[in-house]
Amino acid sequence: MKPHVVVGMSGGVDSSVTALLLLRQGYRVSGLFMKNWEEDDGTEYCTAAQDFADAKQVCERLGVELHTVNFAAEYWDEVFEVFLSEYRAGRTPNPDILCNKQIKFRAFLDYAEDLGADLIAMGHYARVAEEEGRLQLLKGCDPGKDQSYFLYTLQQEQLARTLFPLGGLRKTEVRALAAGAGFANDAKKDSTGICFIGERRFKDFLARYLPARPGDIRTPEGVLLGRHDGLMYYTLGQRSGLGIGGTRAGGQEPWYVLDKDLARNVLVVGQGHDHPLLYRDGLLASRLHWVDGAGPAPGEILRCAAKTRYRQSDQDCRIRLIGEDRLEVVFAQPQRAVTPGQSVVFYQDDCCLGGGVIDLTFNADSRADAA
């Protein structure tokens, strides 16, 4: 008898086709819908009811039992509190990565086991392969949808219990399968925004939880250009929302966020998408995780590729451990808008090696100080 697989059903097309494919492969399939956010009183941003209705329609069409679970408390404690603390410290976090680590592949897996699951499955565009007795996390075959960047914190035990049926497919193929199966969500828009919280006016949302500290907007030379509403609302390389136009000296070229001076509460801006101060030669990262459970040896210099944000092309680099949980990354070419709080994820060809959280960035002339 084929194993029992519990599929994370979100109401979207990816999880729906995941369940469809597993049924066609002969697995015994159940669905599990997660509700992880309860803070909004009204329905302004609420899509959970529609998502559940879509998941229910798909499961009924497939003849699959759909369970529901509320992980709102776990999400608040393990994901959202960390999200807020990172913004409070002036960094820009990636909650999707933490959500995968703490909710989708920990709390969900534990609950699925209580339902009698042998395996779980998710609609992520990624693959798992075995090499010399260890499991590898591989990129999805659709380069525009590959989600391995968000999955680098997965452990061997989690990979061994997880199926990614969409890893070898392109998004167009997934939508075609959904349409062929008669799913009403075959053309449903991909979810965006904060994991499980969704799309919303981010500035208004963040202000509900963190007090803003307005301050000056200045050029690197110290010229005062205006006022910002709070450093937490801005990220490196950002163009829109600055509220400043051209200057007599600088012309009408757009302004970009170059730095956030936390000590002085100053937003540093400059003109030009490729302003030199937006580029860094390297970074230091911590909170490291290696998919194979080992990673490079202390002192070893590993040449590989890295991404410092989702959908970035692979960037050649060399990495070395400089402490038990700290890593130095030096890029072959300077990188634009490398942002503390985001994750740097490492690859060799299609294989995701692991990654960590960016602590700070440096240029070659300041490397000694950074280390």
UniProtKB/Swiss-Prot annotation:
Record InterPro entries: MnmA-like, MnmA-like_C, MnmA-like_central, MnmA-like_central_sf, Rossmann-like_a/b/a_fold
EC number: 2.8.1.13
Ranges for region Interaction with target base in tRNA: 94-96
Record-annotated site: Interaction with tRNA: H124, Q342
Any Pfam family hit: tRNA_Me_trans_C
Annotated catalytic residues: C99 (nucleophile), C195 (cysteine persulfide intermediate)
Superkingdom of the source species: Bacteria
Region (Interaction with tRNA): 145-147, 309-310
Chemical reaction(s) catalysed: S-sulfanyl-L-cysteinyl-[protein] + uridine(34) in tRNA + AH2 + ATP = 2-thiouridine(34) in tRNA + L-cysteinyl-[protein] + A + AMP + diphosphate + H(+)
Compartment(s) of residence: Cytoplasm
Binding site for ATP: G8, M9, S10, G11, G12, V13, D14, S15, M34, G123
Keywords, ordered alphabetically: ATP-binding, Cytoplasm, Disulfide bond, Nucleotide-binding, RNA-binding, Transferase, tRNA processing, tRNA-binding
BP-aspect Gene Ontology terms: tRNA wobble position uridine thiolation
Record-annotated disulphide pairs: C99-C195
SUPFAM superfamilies, per database record: Adenine nucleotide alpha hydrolases-like
GO MF annotations in UniProt: ATP binding; tRNA binding; tRNA-uridine 2-sulfurtransferase activity
Any one cellular-component term (Gene Ontology): cytoplasm
HAMAP family, alphabetized: tRNA_thiouridyl_MnmA
Function of the protein: Catalyzes the 2-thiolation of uridine at the wobble position (U34) of tRNA, leading to the formation of s(2)U34.
Annotated family: Belongs to the MnmA/TRMU family.
Protein name per Swiss-Prot or TrEMBL: tRNA-specific 2-thiouridylase MnmA
Originating organism: Methylococcus capsulatus (strain ATCC 33009 / NCIMB 11132 / Bath)
